[in-house]
Swiss-Prot record:
Gene3D superfamilies: 3.40.50.2300, paz domain (2.170.260.10), Ribonuclease H-like superfamily/Ribonuclease H (3.30.420.10). GO terms for cellular component: cytoplasm; cytosol; extrinsic component of mitochondrial outer membrane; nucleus; P granule; perinuclear region of cytoplasm. The keyword Acetylation does not apply. The gene is AGO3. Residues 291-402 form the PAZ domain. The modification Symmetric dimethylarginine is found at R4, R68, R70. Symmetrically dimethylated on Arg-4, Arg-68 and Arg-70, most likely by csul/PRMT5/DART5. Methylation state probably functions as an indicator of its piRNA binding state. This is Protein argonaute-3. In ovary, expressed in germline stem cells, germline cyst cells, nurse cells and oocytes during early stages. Also found in the somatic cap cells of the germarium. In testis, expressed in germline stem cells, primary gonial cells and early spermatocytes. No expression detected in the somatic hub cells at the apical tip of the testis (at protein level). Expressed in neurons throughout the adult brain and in the mushroom body subdivision in the peduncle. In the mushroom body, expressed only in gamma and core alpha-beta neurons. Component of the ping-pong piRNA processing (4P) complex consisting of krimp, aub and AGO3. Interacts (via N-terminus when not methylated on arginine residues) with krimp (via non-canonical tudor domain); this interaction leads to symmetrical dimethylation on AGO3 arginine residues and its subsequent dissociation from krimp. Krimp associated AGO3 is mostly free of piRNA binding and the interaction plays an important role in the loading of AGO3 with piRNAs; piRNA binding may stimulate dissociation of the two proteins. May form part of a piRNA processing complex consisting of tud, aub and AGO3.
Length: 867
């Protein structure tokens, strides 16, 4: 254990303050929502700060029989007694060593898989009071969720009929139930193990047998509890969009843009270390006040020839709302060969859409020549028996939801929208209290919860957290404190970079009328380079007469030589097709670092200096240089990041990006991307990328790493089993038994919010705040980390799930390392929300998936060419 303790001490300024790293312990309701092998000078500087790397080697001798962190996930509502797809383990029950204390907490094999019976907490850092957006749920011991199997004699295939006949006896079942056609859930225990009812079905006597199976454990009931809260929100007259609920009675109007913002909530019930709780966060939905028909008319007037193609491109895949029933539908297609006068079948015969809407909704269709919107929905019931329900909707009755591309690109409009959607910590707490009051003061909502023995309390959202120490940032010759704000932008542009690559052979391509902008760029670059320690020579200037894409392509092909280090393109404006064409040439056809600059950013005399400073920093990274680092006292450890990109249209390829550190200061990265032919999050080709990265690490360092830490982004809770059983073994096959792996899933899209301060005045926690108790999952090794400073709105923490910790680092080291890595993203002189390796993987995957759409030349793999 001494090796681990010595390593941990290097993370703290004062080793004498060390402690244990693991503790064993019409609607009127107000919503309340108004490449260089040599060691750089920066690395030598780290060595001079008493980094006793020889102590770290003792980590290699700390072993545990089974890898830590193999979390047993929460079963779904219909989990069988015997779970499938158990976590991989090579040891039997008898061979598992039981630890009684220390970081290698007890791990045992049970009938439900491998899990951690001990609570895994860190202890380093100063204690802080934290508030969270969780409400405690208590259960009535006299009630519960009782599982029954229902059989019909003679058998009935139709789920609809099964539900109908069982409903004939609902008064005998207590009036409250959940039934999917096979399994019945009741909040009461029936007096007999088997209960038999008789129903009449077309002169045939139908026997219904209800057989008691078991009382469900709390962790198996969370799906039901979430269904109950969906019913509660419906009682409160909220409209459901996906998993979120919105209040249509209090929209915030943006008249000039013809938009309205609906306030709402997103709720989720789960079992946490603090018990059964409801996570409740504020949410908003943007709704267009223009109908889809108005949008179609605009498109037709803009381009008659390509009208249908443009309409499908803009609308297919979007979600629309029909206000006559407040339901949402996804647009799967537009039927230009049909209109509202077309006939379709209903129970009473055939009717037209015009007649149907007049009869059932009292709506007069005005335009009888408009096309129809085609939508598909899955029917409810047993998944295996669900059918596709097809709908044809009327465009003049449909309203687009969400943010369109033209809205996102309008900065002024986005700032106006943010005035409604950017919610402060105090406002979130007020909204949480208002939600509790609305549920508590609505008898129908209380009846839904009470019938299942549930009650909501509002006294459990104060928890404890920890604040990590302030980090030191290391440049080539000096180190500076990042401060509590974890920002150091002034120091980043006034100190020599950690590793400098001088620029002597390079090209600037610009339009002829942007000659002055190119000259201004060069002059400001030379000024910026003086303080950054970078020498820059005059470039070859290439003037273009036209802004056509082929002009840039020809200029690149004609002027790039073997000695060219970098090419800079100054473009008239931002165009995705031009940008993609330039990147395809420079990343695949003629591999060379490239920088694309919008000429408008060079024409503001007040901002040009800061803009060019950032450009120089980017260019140094793309050339293979590094900007700064932090002290990470590991020896012979490789850190990796993984993320993926999916085509939003769901029809294109997917890209999986893999990034791995290749030097001891974690300032140089090997990057590789795999283009996949079908949409999948769990990547098949990771092992090949991993193997190449190991070879590159050995080439740079003379040996393979002893330990590997992998941060995996883009994985939800539902994919953790698959990740553990399918993705991690790919790395193990490459490593064998020689290298230990710690595998950490990084989750950004979460609804957890944490606040600091008193109950009266709440604010965002400072960077470095970690929470690993109370609101973490009951059966996972996980924690929440706030790494960014957010001055407007509410900060969103990042959720880390440790699936494996075979390196035996324990929670304190993993938490501290995760925070340190957030300082190393070179596009921002401060902390980012996730570790830099994941940010680099995200940038790489996005560039290839969005623009390049092909493999990148291996010559660029050791440079951050995608920044």
């Amino acid at each position: 254990m001494s090796g681990r303790g010595n390593l941990l001490s290097l993370f703290n300024k004062n080793a004498g303050n060390m402690g244990k790293s693991i503790s064993s312990k019409d609607h009127e309701i107000d919503s309340g929502l108004d490449f260089n092998n040599s060691e750089s000078s920066g690395e030598r500087l780290l060595s001079s700060h008493n980094i006793e790397t020889d102590l770290i080697t003792t980590l290699q001798h700390v072993n545990i029989s089974v890898g830590r962190g193999r979390a047993r996930l929460i079963d779904t509502l219909k989990t069988d007694d015997h779970t499938s797809n158990q976590f991989i383990t090579s040891e039997s029950k008898e061979n598992i060593t039981k630890k009684t204390k220390g970081p290698e907490s007890e791990a045992i094999a049970s009938e439900n898989g491998l899990f951690f019976p001990d609570l895994i907490y860190g202890s380093k850092g100063s204690s802080v009071n934290i508030y969270c957006n969780y409400l405690k749920l208590t259960t009535d011991e006299s009630k519960g969720v009782f599982n029954y199997e229902v059989r019909f004699f003679p058998p009935i295939d139709s789920v609809h009929l099964r539900i109908k006949y069982l409903n004939d006896h609902k008064d005998k079942l207590g009036g409250t139930k959940t039934f999917d056609g096979n399994t019945l859930y009741l909040p009461i225990l029936l007096p007999n193990k088997m209960t038999v009812f008789i129903s009449k079905a077309e002169d045939v006597e139908l026997q219904i047998r209800i057989l008691y199976k078991k009382k469900e454990e709390m962790r198996n009931c969370t799906q039901l509890y979430n269904i109950l809260f969906d019913r509660v929100m419906k009682v409160l007259n909220y409209v459901k969009f996906d998993r979120k609920q919105f209040d249509p009675s209090r929209p915030k109007i943006i008249p000039l843009a013809k938009l309205e913002v609906w306030p709402g909530y997103v709720t989720a019930v789960d079992e946490y270390k603090g018990g059964l709780m409801l996570c409740c966060d504020v949410s908003h939905r943007i709704l267009c006040q223009k109908t889809v028909l108005e949008m179609l008319v605009d498109l037709y007037q803009q381009n008659v020839e390509h009208y249908q193609e443009s309409a499908r491109k803009m609308l297919v895949g979007n979600i629309v709302l029909t206000r006559y029933n407040n339901r949402t539908y996804k647009i799967n297609d537009i039927c230009f060969d049909q209109n509202p006068t077309c006939q379709f079948e209903i129970k009473t015969g055939c009717t037209s859409y015009v007649e149907y809407y007049k009869q059932y909704h009292n709506i007069n269709i005005k335009d009888v020549n408009q096309p129809l919107i085609y939508s598909i929905k899955k029917s409810r019931g047993i998944p295996a028996e669900r059918e596709n329900l097809q709908f044809c909707l009327i465009p003049e009755l449909c309203y687009l939801t969400g943010l369109r591309d033209e809205v996102r690109s309008d900065n002024k409009l986005m700032r106006e929208i943010a005035t409604f959607t950017r919610v402060s910590p105090n406002q979130r707490q007020m909204a949480l209290n208002k939600f509790y009051e609305n549920v508590s003061n609505t008898p129908a909502a209380q009846e839904i919860l009470n019938s299942w023995g549930l009650s909501l309390t509002n006294n459990s959202n104060k928890i404890s957290g920890r604040q990590m120490d302030i980090e030191q940032i290391y440049f080539s010759k000096i180190s500076v404190s990042a401060g509590r704000s974890a920002e150091f932008s002034k120091h980043a542009v006034t100190n020599e970079m950690l590793k400098v690559v001088h620029l002597s052979k390079w090209i600037i391509i610009h339009l002829r009328n942007y000659r002055q902008a190119a000259t201004s760029l060069l002059d400001n670059m030379k000024q910026a380079c003086e303080s950054l320690g970078m020498n820059i020579s005059n470039p070859t200037m290439i003037s273009l007469d036209h802004d056509r894409i082929d002009a840039y392509i020809q200029a690149l092909r004609r002027n790039i030589t073997m000695n060219t280090q970098m090419v800079v393109c100054i473009c008239h404006n931002r165009r995705d097709d031009r940008y993609a064409a330039i990147k395809k040439i420079c990343c695949s056809e003629i591999p060379i670092p490239s920088q694309v600059i919008n000429a408008k950013t060079l024409q503001n005399d007040l901002k040009i200096r800061s803009v060019v400073q950032k450009i120089v920093l980017q260019m140094n990274c793309k050339l293979g240089g590094s900007l700064w680092t932090v002290k990470i006292p590991f020896k012979n450890v490789m850190i990796c990041g993984i993320d993926s990109y999916h085509d939003p249209s769901n029809r294109g390829n997917s890209v999986a990006a893999f990034v791995a550190s290749i030097n001891s200061s974690y300032s140089q990265w090997y990057s590789k991307a795999v283009v996949q032919t079908k949409r999948e999050e769990i990547v098949n080709g990771l092992s090949a990328s991993f193997e190449i990265a190991l070879k590159m690490y050995r080439k740079r360092n003379g040996k393979l790493p002893t330990n590997i830490i992998i941060y995996r982004d883009g994985i939800g809770d539902g994919q953790l089993y698959t990740c553990l059983n399918y993705e991690i073994p790919q790395f193990e096959m490459v490593c064998g038994n020689r290298i230990k792996i710690s595998y950490i899933v990084v989750q950004k899209r979460i609804n957890t919010r944490i606040f600091s301060g008193s109950g009266i005045h709440l604010e965002n926690p400072l960077p470095g705040t970690v929470v690993d108790q109370h609101i973490t999952k009951s059966n996972m090794y996980d924690f929440f980390l706030v790494s960014q400073l957010v001055r407007q709105g509410t900060v969103t923490p990042t959720h880390y799930v440790v699936l494996r910790d075979d390196c035996n680092y324990g929670p304190d080291i993993i938490q501290k390392l995760s925070y340190k890595l957030c300082f190393l993203y070179y596009n921002w002189a401060g902390t980012v929300r996730i570790p830099a390796c994941c940010m680099y993987a995200h940038k790489l995957a996005y560039l290839i998936g969005q623009s390049i759409q092909r493999d990148v030349a291996e010559a660029l793999s050791e440079k951050l060419f995608y920044l």
